């Protein structure tokens, strides 16, 4: 049974989701949001970094999936998102987690069966797959979806003798 951390990065709100892959599916462990407030960017990045490290220390995942940066209309927003993502990746790398990156389309495809699913459809599938009775916060739901995508990807790679750890720098680029 593998504990998997999913991260939905953001410079103001970073969602996290932890699931246990039992080999027969995933079980919900925890989820939530790291809220950075409205301080200076370097202060917010430090909060993301510390928050992700705290989640790792609390739950003990061995692997992490994180969403790739998409190209936003606003270049400044995309850069800030990339920096928050970097803070989360460094936190995972410092704790020796296996790290894999997924596009939003890959996550939606793995969880909802279509890369064009909307946030509500993804949330409903997350609730169904993890047997949740209450809706998680949207950023936490996205992070749980990333964790589920990572679990699915790992389970399809392992029987073929592949591992997410074999890639350059411990990060699997799909």
UniProtKB/Swiss-Prot annotation:
GO molecular-function term, one example from the UniProt record: DNA binding
Residues annotated for Mg(2+) 2 binding in this entry: 67
Record: residues binding Mg(2+) 1: 8, 139
This protein's record includes keyword Hydrolase: yes
Major enzyme class: hydrolase
Cofactor needs: Mg(2+)
BP-aspect Gene Ontology terms: DNA recombination; DNA repair
Catalytic activity of the protein: Endonucleolytic cleavage at a junction such as a reciprocal single-stranded crossover between two homologous DNA duplexes (Holliday junction)
EC number of this enzyme: 3.1.21.10
Entry keywords, A to Z: Cytoplasm, DNA damage, DNA recombination, DNA repair, DNA-binding, Endonuclease, Hydrolase, Magnesium, Metal-binding, Nuclease
Subcellular location: Cytoplasm
Superkingdom of origin organism: Bacteria
InterPro entries per UniProt: RNaseH-like_sf, RNaseH_sf, X-over_junc_endoDNase_Mg_BS, X-over_junc_endoDNase_RuvC
Entries under PROSITE patterns matching the protein: RUVC (PS01321)
Note describing how the cofactor binds: Binds 2 Mg(2+) ion per subunit.
Active site: 8, 67, 139
A GO-annotated cellular component: cytoplasm
Function: The RuvA-RuvB-RuvC complex processes Holliday junction (HJ) DNA during genetic recombination and DNA repair. Endonuclease that resolves HJ intermediates. Cleaves cruciform DNA by making single-stranded nicks across the HJ at symmetrical positions within the homologous arms, yielding a 5'-phosphate and a 3'-hydroxyl group; requires a central core of homology in the junction. The consensus cleavage sequence is 5'-(A/T)TT(C/G)-3'. Cleavage occurs on the 3'-side of the TT dinucleotide at the point of strand exchange.
Quaternary data: Homodimer which binds Holliday junction (HJ) DNA. The HJ becomes 2-fold symmetrical on binding to RuvC with unstacked arms; it has a different conformation from HJ DNA in complex with RuvA. In the full resolvosome a probable DNA-RuvA(4)-RuvB(12)-RuvC(2) complex forms which resolves the HJ.
Family to which the UniProt record says this protein belongs: Belongs to the RuvC family.
Protein name per Swiss-Prot or TrEMBL: Crossover junction endodeoxyribonuclease RuvC
Annotated source species: Pseudomonas savastanoi pv. phaseolicola (strain 1448A / Race 6)
């Amino acid at each position: 049974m593998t504990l998997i951390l999913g991260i939905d990065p953001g410079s103001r709100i970073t969602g996290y989701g932890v699931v246990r892959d039992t080999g027969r599916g995933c079980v919900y462990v925890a989820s939530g949001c790291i809220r950075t407030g409205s301080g200076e960017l370097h202060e917010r990045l430090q909060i993301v970094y510390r928050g992700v490290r705290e989640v790792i220390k609390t739950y003990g995942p061995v692997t992490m999936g994180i969403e790739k940066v998409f190209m936003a209309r606003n270049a400044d927003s995309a850069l800030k998102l990339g920096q928050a993502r970097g803070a989360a990746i460094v936190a995972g790398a410092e704790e020796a987690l296996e790290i894999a990156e997924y596009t939003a389309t890959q996550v939606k495809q793995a969880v909802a069966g279509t890369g064009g699913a909307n946030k509500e459809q993804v949330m409903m599938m997350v609730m169904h797959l993890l047997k949740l009775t209450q809706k998680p916060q949207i950023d936490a739901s996205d992070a749980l979806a990333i964790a589920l995508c990572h679990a699915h990807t790992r389970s399809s790679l392992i029987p073929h003798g592949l591992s997410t750890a074999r890639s350059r720098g411990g990060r699997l680029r799909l």
